[in-house]
UniProtKB/Swiss-Prot annotation:
One of its GO terms (cellular component) is endoplasmic reticulum membrane. It comes from Homo sapiens (Human). This is Peptidyl-prolyl cis-trans isomerase FKBP2. Pfam families: FKBP_C. Interacts with ARFGEF1/BIG1 and the C-terminal of EPB41L2. The keyword Isomerase applies. Its main location: endoplasmic reticulum.
Amino acid sequence: MRLSWFRVLTVLSICLSAVATATGAEGKRKLQIGVKKRVDHCPIKSRKGDVLHMHYTGKLEDGTEFDSSLPQNQPFVFSLGTGQVIKGWDQGLLGMCEGEKRKLVIPSELGYGERGAPPKIPGGATLVFEVELLKIERRTEL
């Protein structure tokens, strides 16, 4: 019996460690960035102030799609790192190459927070984005 309890406690401590790692020290989940497609030639990488042309599909954790640029074949264009998009994008799209694809898993704190963006995005929602960087417009400093 003693051995069984030891196993249970070991498994429990491993599970709690995994949860603590995934949520971070303060109980908040962290931004997850996965590279889905790399490019062989990358002369410039995205940085703060660049104008990015992106294709994207946004989903909730359960797979419900809430937005996409693909049906209209109209890229979304914005300036990186200037607050024009959610914080998860400003952070998760840094250092990308043209043609690269990423999957971003964005906790609500870096998305739309507890308020959400009704009616499609509920409060506290974790967002999952598949993104592709089509073009970088580098802004020269004045």
